[in-house]
């Protein structure tokens, strides 16, 4: 081959390579463009023919005493084991978390059964062996660190109550101090003669903090020799919600979800591992000093039951939410009461309803009235047990409760533990309870599980749902997206699903019995997990109108819904969509059946750089909804971009004579979030 021929051949090869390479790049670019331009269409029918009202009760909350959600959490009592009963009734008993200040040569501390409270006989006796000349500087005594440290804030006031008696004169310093006692944040002395303390005497004081410490403790110290008894010690911040005892910041986190109901007090907390440790409402009412408290053996900690039957109903009222009371039906995790012997439990349930609904002259209504609430609470729903359907005596016991309650209170709606989503129940019920905990991908796929549930039976109450397996970690974006898709499915099936709540609601970071949870807190700080923020996307859903919608295109990673709602006299169509995939998705929204223009749009997006990202105390707002305003263009269809691994909502302001306007009851007025 000569030189010229060689150059021609080489040029041909280069040209061919360039053409083939260009074609390959072109194909790649076309593929990328195709991916970027791929459109998923949500067809929305806004006409009156297909619209359907969403139940007023659809989204609520479930409060269980787990993870120190109440004791050391929502219930603002700072003292743990305030009556010294946690160590049991055999004396001498363990006084944990109380600790002694001083050594064995200067003080001796022991429990005895000398209390003036018949249901709480344990008291603390403090034998002071030293005097002002021999006691260590600052004196000797006892201290209580509360629940992993008390949050004492400068300028705030705290009410301290205690019962005391003595065989001699006393001079006791009652103080909030730093965790090691070296810094005094607030203090007052109890000075009394022996003649004034021969019998148990109640002492109250208001301490104002001159410093801040979120790991503080309450301590009693003295340098006066003698015997002193203490019992029923309480320390409460004065700024609880309406003075009702609820920690303000945690209460506000619940309020912001606009819950339409609150299910309480459990959960497994209601059952107990053994019936002897189950929650029994009658032991949680009347004055707090008279409540014996109990050991919750499922979640392995003591509760003084300051957050009791009365307080739960007060909480529901303060939230503007319907109470759903779950009571024990004679069944725990490990033992059961046979149906022939269950009537005492039935009577306890009837009495519990009377406590809430009875007039102030009734037996149990008078107890409620004496506690400061003469008017009855609203109670429309009760649940017979928790997750007990497959226990051998459940159905027999359930029928005893059902018949007795319907006879006494025919309007009350009764919730069965048995799942009717796949097959009919074999017993009467107004609602059936449905619980699901699973992987994120699995929960995403279950968004259509209620599509084929029979509509002629009891309604569904999805009272516990969450992604809680390994891929959820402590509460990440991945878990939240799976839950968001599931909730969209429940919203679209709200003709059968009438109530929904996440579980668990709270976790004290010092006692993570169950993870993940919606709200994480310690003594002074808190944050919402992505699962909490997902629920914010549904605050307008209860009582709104569901619009018939259909997704078309490659929708394996997308779920969406459409509703209309009204707030402050303005009408909105809200589009919500989950993108569970790794690529952005273009969402075209085509609305028919509505002669209206969209005058504005508010976009809200929940996403993060990594699907495994979590919020934390150091970065509590890493994953929170980001809101922005969108300008609307003059076009028939709407186009939105769904970022990878995201949950988005679009509130479209409409204006037309034909716009959907749903009446809103006085009890469910909506406030603007614009």
Swiss-Prot record:
According to the UniProt entry, where is the signal peptide?
A: 1-24
Query: Where is it localised?
Result: Secreted, Extracellular space, Extracellular matrix
Q: Which UniProt keywords apply?
A: Extracellular matrix, Glycoprotein, Hydrolase, Secreted, Signal
Record EC number: 3.2.1.55, 3.2.1.-
What cellular-component terms does GO give this entry? extracellular region
Q: Phenotype when inactivated?
A: No visible phenotype, even in asd1 and asd2 double mutant.
**Positions glycosylated per UniProt:** 48, 180, 199, 210, 361, 522, 548
Q: Name one GO molecular function term.
A: alpha-L-arabinofuranosidase activity
Q: Which Pfam families match?
A: Alpha-L-AF_C, ASD1_dom
Name the top EC class.
hydrolase
**SUPFAM superfamilies for this protein:** (Trans)glycosidases, Galactose-binding domain-like, Glycosyl hydrolase domain
InterPro entries (UniProt xref): Alpha-L-AF_C, ASD1_cat, Galactose-bd-like_sf, Glyco_hydro_b, Glycoside_hydrolase_SF, Glycosyl_Hydrolase_51
Instruction: Give the induction note.
Output: Not induced by hormones or during leaf senescence.
**Catalytic reaction(s) noted:** Hydrolysis of terminal non-reducing alpha-L-arabinofuranoside residues in alpha-L-arabinosides
Tissue specificity as recorded in UniProt: High expression in flowers, siliques and stems. Observed in the vasculature of older root tissue, at the tip of anthers and in the petal blade of fully developed flowers, in floral abscission zones and in silique replum tissue. Expressed in the cambium and phloem, but not in the xylem or in the vascular system of floral tissues.
Q: Which GO terms describe its biological process?
A: L-arabinose metabolic process
Tell me which PANTHER family the record gives. Answer: ALPHA-L-ARABINOFURANOSIDASE 1, ALPHA-L-ARABINOFURANOSIDASE 2
| Record family assignment | Belongs to the glycosyl hydrolase 51 family.
Stated role: May be involved in the coordinated dissolution of the cell wall matrix during abscission and in the secondary cell wall formation in xylem vessels.
Q: What is this protein called?
A: Alpha-L-arabinofuranosidase 2
Organism of origin is Arabidopsis thaliana (Mouse-ear cress)
Gene name per UniProt: ASD2
């Amino acid at each position: 081959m000569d030189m010229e021929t060689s150059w021609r051949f080489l040029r041909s090869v280069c040209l061919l390579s360039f053409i083939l390479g260009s074609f390959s790049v072109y194909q790649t670019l076309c593929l990328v463009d195709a991916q970027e331009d791929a459109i998923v269409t949500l067809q929305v029918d806004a006409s009156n023919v297909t619209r359907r009202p969403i139940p007023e009760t659809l989204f609520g909350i479930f409060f269980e005493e787990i993870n120190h959600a109440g004791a050391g959490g929502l219930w603002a009592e700072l003292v743990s084991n305030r009556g010294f009963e946690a160590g049991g009734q055999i004396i001498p008993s363990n006084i944990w978390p109380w600790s002694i200040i001083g050594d064995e040569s200067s003080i001796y501390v022991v429990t005895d059964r000398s209390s003036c409270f018949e249901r709480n006989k344990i008291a603390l006796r403090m034998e002071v062996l030293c005097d002002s000349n021999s006691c260590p500087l600052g004196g000797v005594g006892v201290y209580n660190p509360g629940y992993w440290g008390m949050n004492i804030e400068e300028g705030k006031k705290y009410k301290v109550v205690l019962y005391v008696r003595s065989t001699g004169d006393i001079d006791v310093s009652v103080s909030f101090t730093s965790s090691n006692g070296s810094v005094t944040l607030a203090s007052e002395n109890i000075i009394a003669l022996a003649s004034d303390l021969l019998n148990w005497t109640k002492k109250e004081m208001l301490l104002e903090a001159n410093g801040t410490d979120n790991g503080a403790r309450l301590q009693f110290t003295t340098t006066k020799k003698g015997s002193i008894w203490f019992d029923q010690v309480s320390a409460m911040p004065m700024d609880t919600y309406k003075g009702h005892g609820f920690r303000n910041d945690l209460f506000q986190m619940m309020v912001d979800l606009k819950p339409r109901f609150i299910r309480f007090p459990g959960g497994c907390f209601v059952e107990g591992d053994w019936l002897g440790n189950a929650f029994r409402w009658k032991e949680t009412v009347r004055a707090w000093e008279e409540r014996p408290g109990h050991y919750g053996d499922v979640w392995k900690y003591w509760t003084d039951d300051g957050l009791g039957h009365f307080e739960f109903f007060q909480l529901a009222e303060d939230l503007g939410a319907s109470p759903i009371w779950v009571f024990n039906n004679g069944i725990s995790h490990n033992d059961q009461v046979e149906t022939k012997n269950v009537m005492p439990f039935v009577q306890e349930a009837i009495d519990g309803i009377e406590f809430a609904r009875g007039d102030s002259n009734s037996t149990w209504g008078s107890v409620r009235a004496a506690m400061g609430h003469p008017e009855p609470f609203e109670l429309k729903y009760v649940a017979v047990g928790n997750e007990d359907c497959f226990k051998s005596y459940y159905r027999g016991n359930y029928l005893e409760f059902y018949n007795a309650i319907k006879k006494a209170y025919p309007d009350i709606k009764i919730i069965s533990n048995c799942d009717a989503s796949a097959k009919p129940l074999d017993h009467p019920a107004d609602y059936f309870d449905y619980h699901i905990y699973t992987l994120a991908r699995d929960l995403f796929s279950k968004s259509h599980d209620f599509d084929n549930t029979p509509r002629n039976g009891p309604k569904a109450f999805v009272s516990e749902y969450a992604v809680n397996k390994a891929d959820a970690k402590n509460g990440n974006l991945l878990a939240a997206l799976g839950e968001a898709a599931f909730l969209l499915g429940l919203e679209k099936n709200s003709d059968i699903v009438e109530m929904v709540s996440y579980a668990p609601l709270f976790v004290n970071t010092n006692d993570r019995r169950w993870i993940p949870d919606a709200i994480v807190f310690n003594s002074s700080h808190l944050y919402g997990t992505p699962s909490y923020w997902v629920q914010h996307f549904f605050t307008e859903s209860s009582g709104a109108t569901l619009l018939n919608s259909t997704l078309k295109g490659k929708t394996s990673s997308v779920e969406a819904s459409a509703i209309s709602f009204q707030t402050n006299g303005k009408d909105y169509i809200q589009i919500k969509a989950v993108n569970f995939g790794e690529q952005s998705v273009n969402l075209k929204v085509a609305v028919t059946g509505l002669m209206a223009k969209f005058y504005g749009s508010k976009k809200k997006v929940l996403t993060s750089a990594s699907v495994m990202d979590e919020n934390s105390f150091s970065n509590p707002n890493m994953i929170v909804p980001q809101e922005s305003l969108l300008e609307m263009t003059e076009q028939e269809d709407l186009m939105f971009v769904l970022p990878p691994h995201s949950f988005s909502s679009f509130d479209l302001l409409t204006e037309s004579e034909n716009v959907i306007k749903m009446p809103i009851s006085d009890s469910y007025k909506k406030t603007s979030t614009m």
